[in-house]
Amino acid sequence: MTFSTENNKQIVLGEELGPLSDNERLKKQSNLLRGTIAEDLQDRITGGFTADNFQLIRFHGMYQQDDRDIRNERTKQKLEPLHNVMLRARMPGGIITPTQWLAIDKFATEHSLYGSIRLTTRQTFQFHGVLKPNIKLMHQTLNNIGIDSIATAGDVNRNVLCTTNPVESELHQEAYEWAKKISEHLLPKTRAYAEIWLDGEKVESTEEDEPILGKTYLPRKFKTTVVIPPQNDVDVHANDLNFVAIADNGKLVGFNVLVGGGLAMTHGDTSTYPRRADDFGFIPLEKTLDVAAAVVTTQRDWGNRSNRKNAKTKYTLDRVGTDVFKAEVEKRAGIQFEASRPYEFTERGDRIGWVEGIDGKFHLALFIENGRLLDYPGKPLKTGVAEIAKIHKGDFRMTANQNLIVAGVPKSEKAKIEKIAREHGLMDDNVSEQRKNSMACVAFPTCPLAMAEAERFLPQFVTDVEGILEKHGLPENDNIILRVTGCPNGCGRAMLAEIGLVGKAPGRYNLHLGGNRAGTRVPKMYKENITDKQILEEIDLLVARWSKEREEGEAFGDFTIRAGIIQEVFVSKRDFYA
């Protein structure tokens, strides 16, 4: 056997990794993710969950949070934090119907503290601020419209992303179907979710099995995508497992498989780093699910269960060797990877506005700043989407860039939908290309991990950057892919941006430079722990040089490397901190 977790210590390929982390105890004792969540729900003395259940609810798609803006005030009043949960829905490929949309809109309005729907970088939506008495209702509301939140958090395969590309409608549909199949294939098989939230019939856990994930699930979170080149809107290098669609005459014939991407790191710990995924090669369509399971089970058995900071697939590849990991996947899947088929990523932003698909239907991509759908003064965005949902006969597609596409609109309905969108501030011709190419995670006040502002910080920061670009005479198309993430876990995918800000402390960030527009290069830290004012001063100096010294059409990230401002990261383990 190549691995063992006996006697509370982990050995992989003859190497002892150390004692198992406490999360491994928690999963083992959880009775296949049940824990005592059902009992906790009945406890109305506290709005939160006990320590173990606090972790276990993640496997059910929720995080316990509180409002950090009022935490100190509640402490002064001798009150516990305002505990609530954030739920992330499971929506492979991000497709949702108008009927489903109206139901989630109603729930967010009536049963959440913030009244918003948050589109996320995981191509789904989140409810924020749901109090304990409403949690069961939330799951049952979703179930009634065919949605769940199983495995959108925790040590499992998370929501499967798929390129939002309705123009190539036939190819997109095939890719989307594979995203759904992969999601279903890798889902936990436990009945815990149905039992606890949907009042399903209880079963003895001895009758259940987890053939792919195992009874202690994965060492850490696991992220999967299906991507259609030349678009890289899902950011393949942020994910553990990627299926790159290879088409022949518009028909899907197979996938190139990329393994071991990931962006999370820990401040001050050089054993952690963002990493690009490795290309394992091409597979035919019929081997897709076998390969998905083989990658997941290899990571299940070989991933680090002693140190969670080094537990992701990217570290497993660097520890055991990419070739060794790949050979094990081939053995388990009963396949030999073929040479990768050629493809190229050239863009990853959403095409905001109307585009016509090859089927003659039209698709309207709406720019939603930071993905937050709420009714703002003079911009009732959330109401606007609901009004569109009332008349729209196609579907909606959430994007990994936190935007929303109204898809499948007949030509005869275009004017009607555009009128609603414009009346509610969902279409604005004055939004700059720079703003469209900027993104932030949620951070304060709801994310417990946030070290600095992100979503609330970004709008004004982008305005300031727009001013710098204008000052140096740069035209509208010369924008910079700019991302802000409130902590080094990287939900805002700043570690694949041309300018990436990573929260370090309130009002302070690490400034990273050197990513590229296609999302195939990891940026490197340029300045550490500096204020937003200092960041803008640095950007001003850099943009001044870019405007004067760049080559024809040279993007900002490429310029910073060619000019020697920052060193290129080729191999993250070696170069990221060098």
Swiss-Prot record:
Its EC number is 1.8.1.2. SUPFAM superfamilies: Nitrite and sulphite reductase 4Fe-4S domain-like (SSF56014), Nitrite/Sulfite reductase N-terminal domain-like (SSF55124). Keywords: 4Fe-4S, Amino-acid biosynthesis, Cysteine biosynthesis, Heme, Iron, Iron-sulfur, Metal-binding, NADP, Oxidoreductase. Siroheme binds at C491. Pathway: Sulfur metabolism; hydrogen sulfide biosynthesis; hydrogen sulfide from sulfite (NADPH route): step 1/1. Signal peptide: none annotated. The keyword Signal does not apply. One of its GO terms (molecular function) is sulfite reductase (ferredoxin) activity. It catalyses: hydrogen sulfide + 3 NADP(+) + 3 H2O = sulfite + 3 NADPH + 4 H(+). Pfam families: NIR_SIR (PF01077), NIR_SIR_ferr (PF03460). InterPro entries: CysI, NiRdtase/SiRdtase_haem-b_fer, Nit/Sulf_reduc_fer-like_dom_sf, NO2/SO3_Rdtase_4Fe4S_dom, NO2/SO3_Rdtase_4Fe4S_prot, NO2/SO3_Rdtase_4Fe4S_sf, NO2/SO3_Rdtase_FeS/sirohaem_BS. Its cofactor is siroheme; [4Fe-4S] cluster. [4Fe-4S] cluster binds at C441, C447, C487, C491. Belongs to the nitrite and sulfite reductase 4Fe-4S domain family. This is Sulfite reductase [NADPH] hemoprotein beta-component. The gene is cysI.
